């Protein structure tokens, strides 16, 4: 049996199974976001750290990503521009992408940041403050973070201890966030407005806490394209590592379009 015949034989069966699974577990009702191109936002952690393939892209992969957007004249915007459009209820009529990096690993500062800077590509670094305060090897220092800001980089909050937010009490999480605010004020003189959930995890209670602390937008780690219909407290990002940082996957994500979630059940975890 050739490949096409196998596909025709087995695909309908898998389609039926997928339909049954979706109806059973309550996957959200989805439609295309009308007349919007959207923003594909990417998330990196490490660069060229082969010991950590689940959180690192190879240098060759990163170079291929940059080469693709330069050669194809892809519009790259900052996370602040995304937030501005969301706050003003503007549609994303032009196809764009955006870049972010979590955790402030030294490989970002030493390898990736010079490349972002060379091509004037905006990028936001989400920082968990405790690991920086402790001068841990393999992470950036506050001096390097300040240099990154001075050279045009953008900073975001990522909690103090990189905790699993929904698994802890509201009181504990609030204390953690306030500790990170104190560290930011001490070391860079301001508290960043942008926020990203460690591990991409949140809950309705956590979102309410962010609102109490005047954090108005937050990014997760789930794949998807941002549109004007997006939940401001659960903005999607395409996560990139060795397995999911191939040229094919990156180019597919760059050229993806937004889907509008009309109904989501259950509402909380």
Model features per residue range: what roles?
Residues 80-87, 127-129, 196-201, 222-225:
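Short, solvent-exposed turn/loop segments enriched in Gly/Ser/Thr/Pro and often Arg
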Residues 15-27:
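Bacterial N-terminal signal peptides
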Residues 37, 42-52, 93-97, 105-205, ...:
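Metal-dependent polysaccharide deacetylase catalytic core of the NodB/CE4 family, i.e.
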Residues 213-222:
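Catalytic-core region of carbohydrate-active enzymes that cleave or remodel glycosidic bonds
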Residues 29-97, 244-269:
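N-terminal pre-catalytic segment of deacetylase/amide-hydrolase enzymes
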Residues 1-11:
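N-terminal secretory signal peptides that target proteins for export/translocation
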């Amino acid at each position: 049996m050739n490949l096409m015949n196998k596909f025709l034989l087995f695909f309908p069966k898998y389609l039926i199974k997928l339909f049954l699974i979706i109806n059973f577990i309550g996957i959200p009702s989805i439609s295309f976001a009308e007349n919007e191109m959207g923003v594909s936002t990417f998330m990196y952690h490490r660069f060229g750290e082969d010991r950590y393939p689940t959180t690192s892209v190879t240098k060759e992969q990163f170079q291929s990503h940059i080469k693709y957007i330069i050669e194809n004249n892809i519009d790259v915007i900052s996370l602040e521009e995304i937030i501005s459009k969301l706050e003003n209820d503007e549609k994303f009529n032009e196809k764009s992408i955006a870049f972010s990096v979590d955790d402030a690993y030294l490989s970002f500062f030493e390898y990736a940041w010079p490349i972002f800077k060379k091509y004037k590509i905006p990028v936001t670094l989400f920082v968990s403050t405790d690991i920086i305060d402790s001068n841990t090897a393999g992470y950036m220092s506050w001096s390097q973070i300040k240099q990154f800001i001075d050279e045009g980089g953008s900073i975001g909050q990522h909690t103090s201890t990189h905790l699993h937010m929904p698994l802890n009490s509201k009181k504990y999480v609030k204390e953690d966030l306030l500790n990170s605010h104190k560290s930011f004020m001490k070391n860079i003189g301001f508290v960043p407005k942008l926020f990203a959930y460690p591990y991409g995890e949140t809950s309705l209670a956590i979102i309410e806490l962010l609102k109490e602390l005047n954090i108005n937008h937050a990014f997760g780690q789930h794949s998807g394209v941002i549109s004007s219909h997006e939940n401001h407290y659960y903005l999607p990002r395409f996560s990139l590592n060795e397995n999911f940082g191939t040229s094919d996957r990156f180019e597919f994500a760059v050229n993806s379009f937004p889907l509008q979630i009309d109904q989501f059940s259950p509402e909380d975890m």
